[in-house]
């Protein structure tokens, strides 16, 4: 018999898996303060079809208890007395960046009508699924395999507050996993400190002479709880690891893994280990672990993909905080990748230099969630402050002229806003680069590395890039998303020539002989005497805010049409080619399968996707396809910020926000400042 999950409401909309909220709410009574105070938990429960209620339950109602917490007895007693069912609630196996005790809300819950996944004395919904469900659906197992690879590659775990720069010892070791003292899973297993000491002794006995690394729980490292091991257990060959390190890095260096019942044992299975298990967790007994206390009822042999599919795809309910809806596992991975990256970048704090006053509140929102940014105007002072306060240093890219600078350079991203930066509309996308900056080819950048590495994408990355490509081309999104619809343009061989800001950093660093809009127009006309040339001035230049004007007389001689205040996406659908110095419109044209000719060395040139008349760096020898270029440029490289939830977010959320003028528009203060700057356009140094 196939057990029914707590929620059965997933359906597929093209490539996207959608989870619908329940249409009717069942009363769920609770007697635990956590259900009252945790807003996101209450919201997930509501979307799952439960109405959290105080009082006494009636027949047909349910009582909620939190796992096997010490105060669960109240719920058990009332459920028994009122003869109603129990619903056991627990965090899902991927929870958040930081533990709940540190304040992060959950991204998923487990709702179990039968038992607790960590208590083997009574079967739970997950165990029933692992026992009886065929778990043989090809699409389900494909999703599981892809998610396992993705989780390992991106270092995603239940908690994710660790830096990827931290590495375990270089020498091989036996990994022994500690757990929080008195945890419900430990109590359910009927074990204590003596059993943890026995586990450590077994690891020493079975691996004589080997180094042993004891991994502390995240809450132990943060000082929120204590564990079963301490510094007293350290010897010449035993080390207590109290530094937050990715579990996936730890598994790479481990010759064996020992655990009582930690979720890290499950992750060890996903990493290819067969862990020694001394407790009776949900992942024991299926032929994937070496069980010291075998469970007689678990006789089935499962694959890693089957175990993962049940535990991570079918069993939990997942929540999307951006769209405020239930979602699939893949959406939670999008969320955790974005939020974990932000924490890993920002948790040490930043000293920020070269940031204009109007940008600072928005930069504070994006980069200052862990520690507020310290702003400095002088680069030398910023460097000293960075060293003194042990913070990282970020510099607006155009303000850092030193190519050898160790600072992280910051610049607007490629899906920026609905409106221009020069009109003080804050960006929803920013890039940070520790090597260089994407527009300057004189030095390698992180984007350049990512494009080179995108020659080979995983299947899940290809699927995501394809979906994003379709979203961008269907919605017509570009960097700024402004302007009117282009007029109908007829004729053969229509060439778009995008104007640029002539003192823009990409012009100053990535062009050769042709570095003005007039020189560009002249060169394109000389090379294409019979083509229809469409000149589109840069919107900042049109507004009188930046340099780069081509006179009406000059443009009338060289171009067939001059198109002002036009949304470029409506123009790209009507042209055959784009000829440019370094404009981002060249990249946007590639996304729409147009021929692109470059006179400079923009980030997208030199990879075999453009016809290059300039001199891209010879080091660009990789040959990614268009999806590889898109994945590196729009998914892997930038950071995105959701103006609605004020959270780091995946690119797909920004795509949706950019279609909503209210979500992605001006703040009232910046709207006033923008109008004032228009009056002071000739004094741009005051506001740029």
Question: Positions of the model-derived regions?
Answer:
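Catalytic-core helical/loop segments in enzymes performing group transfer/polymerization on anionic/lipid-linked
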Residues: 2-688
